[in-house]
Swiss-Prot record:
Gene3D superfamilies: Pleckstrin-homology domain (PH domain)/Phosphotyrosine-binding domain (PTB), Rho GTPase activation protein. Rho GTPase-activating protein involved in the signal transduction pathway that regulates endothelial cell capillary tube formation during angiogenesis. Acts as a GTPase activator for the RAC1 by converting it to an inactive GDP-bound state. Inhibits RAC1-dependent lamellipodia formation. May also play a role in transcription regulation via its interaction with VEZF1, by regulating activity of the endothelin-1 (EDN1) promoter. This is Rho GTPase-activating protein 22. The keyword Cell division does not apply. Predominantly present in endothelial cells (at protein level). Interacts with VEZF1. Residues 360-433, 438-457, 480-511, 555-596 are annotated as: Disordered. The keyword Hydrolase does not apply. Residues 407-421, 438-456, 491-504, 581-594 have a biased composition (Polar residues). CDD domains: RhoGAP_ARHGAP22_24_25. The modification Phosphoserine is found at residues 365, 397. InterPro entries: PH-like_dom_sf, PH_domain, Rho_GTPase_activation_prot, RhoGAP, RhoGAP_dom. GO terms for biological process: angiogenesis; cell differentiation; regulation of postsynapse organization; regulation of small GTPase mediated signal transduction; signal transduction.
């Protein structure tokens, strides 16, 4: 039986429908080398609804797209497990399409293959896959996510990349504290933008920020010149910090840092110690970047009188980018906003105390450690005149204005004088438990029984940090003298500084504590002490006053080695009683001259501290006064503007009253005219009626 025309049409329609369905639904050929679903699946990077254009009928169909690994899957529904098709993104490129002026509501982008070998990997359309997002923001998110996947094998895509991976990738350019993008943005802002009003608060141009982001993600290094907008570069820096997969302070440390913020609100000194401990425990890359950013933000707030960006404003802007919870629900964000802002304020304001200035050449050294070298003490060296008293080699990782608290048991214990020479173990690592800027001295800590070796407490190391370690190298092992009871007053005489960035005084005026100390050293040790005093003088008396030491030394049995080595300038050397004259008799700490020198030094320390406090108070008062004046000026402007608006409203009210009176008068006139017309009409009709009646009466007799 021959097929009829209708059967032929049905067969052709069935074949056409089957072929069209296979093309539209994205089915791949079932050849042995082309499986339907790839075997290797990566993590889900992004998922959402998109519209894809069908290949034959060119209409749009909505599908659930999932970006997993380097493949883009699409499903008919969100709950389906079997994809209708997938697109391999390796070797492809994604492009944003300009909206059609006739139909501006479409947000289109397309994925095109990079070469002839990649074209067969796009199942729905061998040329390009056209997709449409629901909004401009959604389209930009999809394009950025797909580009990161495309550029990831090439070592690119710095935005959204883990900080450790970025640092590891840029290690070939040399040791750095921050990624190249951050350094480039910071250098440009430091050069051209510190005086820009509203820095980091005013947004940059969105399209320029996106172009710069794409350039950095592509591996390019765009240069900033005089035509580059400062706010655009600032927005790019904030965008990089915001798009880190894990913030600078990791998610696991979020609760610990919030606890530090709560402690800061109760006890600022203890909170600073705990915060420094938490900062030192950060990973190396995070630690370096946080230190770099806080130092830069401190430079920005130093120009707050011009750029109007105080520490609080910078903390508000950068706090959520530096420290944020892993699950950003509204309740958690509202509860931690004030704490995060306060914590960021402390990090910026006290960055010099919280971050130890470690060297880039020694990244393996942990934060907060002091390395004590070998130290040998022999009786033969004591007995020889002119011998180098105590050779001590100490290297320290404490550099900069970082504070340290040394344990009482950290110095090596030496044997008695009758025993053999005691040698301390060489190259020991002592971990400092805390970094502290304001040290609170307890009175009971000064007490120590007799016969116990010397203990040393170093609450603060000032900006010239190495003078302390060098100065301590001249100390000998000794016992506490009988005057240790009088040293109790030194702890109670301590008082905290009014501000955290002003080092607390150790009250050198407690002459009883100083008077109970006597020592005699050899000539070489004397030079070390003098050098330490010189460094102490260079680092300002306020920094020297922050050092509190407790010791009691027995008179040294050294014979007279040289004479006439006493410093000629007693008025400019704080450690002059330490140096001595080189004779076998120890200096008398109770002499009037030395007591006068000590009192003068104590008064100088107090005066320097009070001057620093007054200077800071004056700065704070000027700043608050300036802010009050600015607020008053704004209020005056607002009041004048309100008065002008009130005058305008009064004029409008007067005009409305005039119009109302005019309308009432017009209404009254209209009513009078209406009444007049009514009477005239009545008279007219009455006259007309009488005339009509008279005419009828005259006709009737006829």
């Amino acid at each position: 039986m021959l097929p009829t025309a209708s059967s032929k049409r049905r067969t052709f329609a069935a074949r056409y429908f089957t072929r069209s369905k296979s093309l539209v639904m994205g089915e791949q050929s079932r050849s042995p080398g082309r499986p339907l679903v790839p075997h290797k699946l990566g993590p889900v990077l992004k998922a959402g609804w998109l519209r894809k254009q069908r290949s034959i009928m060119k209409n749009w169909q909505q599908r659930w797209f999932v970006l997993r690994g380097d493949q883009l899957f699409y499903y008919k529904d969100k709950d389906e497990s079997k994809p209708q098709g997938f697109i391999s993104l390796q070797g492809t490129q994604v492009t944003e399409l300009l909206p059609d002026p006739e139909d501006p509501g479409k947000h289109l982008f397309e994925i095109t293959p990079g070469g002839a070998t990649e074209r067969e990997k796009v199942p729905a359309n061998p040329e390009a896959l056209l997709l449409m997002a629901s909004s401009q923001r959604d389209m930009e998110d999809w394009v950025q996510a797909i580009r990161r996947v495309i550029w990831a094998p090439l070592g690119r895509g710095i935005f959204g990349q883990r900080l450790e991976d970025t640092v590891h990738h840029e290690r070939k350019f040399g040791p750095r504290l921050a990624p190249l993008l951050v350094e480039q943005c910071v250098d440009f802002i430091r050069e051209r933008g510190l005086s820009e009003e509203g820095l980091f608060r005013m947004p940059g141009q969105a399209n320029l920020v996106r172009d710069l982001q794409d350039s950095f993600d592509c591996g390019e290094k765009p240069l900033f010149d005089s035509t580059t907008d400062v706010h655009t570069v600032a927005s790019l820096l904030k965008l990089y910090l915001r798009e880190l997969p894990e913030p600078v302070i990791p998610f696991a440390r979020y609760e610990d840092f919030l606890s530090c913020a709560q402690l800061l609100t109760k006890d600022e000194g203890e909170g600073t110690v705990e915060l420094a401990k938490q900062v030192s425990n950060l990973p190396q890359a995070n630690y370096n970047l946080l230190r770099y950013i806080c130092k830069f933000l401190d430079e920005v707030q130093a120009h707050s009188d011009v750029n109007k960006m105080s520490v609080q404003n910078l903390a508000t802007v950068f706090g959520p980018n530096i420290l944020r919870p892993q699950i950003e629900d509204p309740v958690t964000i509202m509860e931690g906003t004030s704490l995060v802002q306060h914590l960021m304020t402390v990090l910026i304001r006290k960055h010099g105390q919280l971050f130890a200035a470690t060297s880039l050449e020694e990244p393996a050294s942990p934060h907060g450690t002091v390395e004590w070298g070998s130290e040998e003490v022999t009786r033969d060296h004591r007995g020889e005149p002119g011998s180098p008293g105590l050779p001590t080699h100490r290297t320290s990782s404490l550099d900069g204005p970082a504070a340290a608290v040394l344990s009482r048991t950290s110095p090596p214990r030496l044997g008695s004088q009758t025993g053999p020479a005691a040698t301390s173990p060489g190259k020991k690592m002592h971990t400092l438990p805390v970094w502290k800027s304001s040290f609170r001295q307890q009175g009971s800590r000064s007490e120590s029984p007799k016969g116990v070796n010397s203990s040393l407490e170093v609450p603060i190391i000032s900006s010239g940090g190495n003078w302390l370690i060098n100065g301590l190298s001249s100390l000998r092992s000794h016992r506490r003298a009988s005057s240790g009871d009088r040293l109790k007053d030194t702890g109670s005489a301590q008082r905290l500084s009014t501000y955290d960035n002003v080092p607390p005084s150790s009250q050198f005026s407690s002459t009883a504590s100083v008077a109970s100390t006597s020592w005699s050293v050899a000539s070489s040790s004397r030079e070390a002490s003098v050098s330490s005093c010189t460094a102490c003088r260079a680092s300002n008396s306020s920094a020297c006053s922050s050092l509190h030491t407790e010791w009691a030394l027995e008179p040294s049995p050294l014979p007279s080695s040289s004479e006439g080595h006493q410093s000629p300038d007693l008025g400019h050397s704080l450690d002059e009683p330490c140096v001595g004259s080189g004779s076998s008799e120890p200096n008398d700490p109770g002499s009037p001259t030395q007591a006068h020198v000590r009192r003068c030094r104590a008064l100088q320390g107090q005066v320097a501290e009070l001057r620093a406090e007054l200077c800071q108070q004056r700065t704070e008062y000027k700043r608050s006064l300036k802010s009050i004046e600015e607020g008053s000026a704004d209020l005056r402007k607002q009041m004048s503007r309100l008065e002008e608006e009130l005058d305008q409203e009064r004029k409008k009210y007067a005009m409305l009253e005039i119009k109302l009176r005019n309308s009432e008068r017009a209404r009254e006139d209209a009513e009078r005219r209406n009444q007049l017309l009514q009477r005239e009409m009545e008279e007219f009709f009455s006259t007309l009626g009488s005339l009509t009646t008279g005419t009828k009466g005259s006709r009737a007799p006829e």
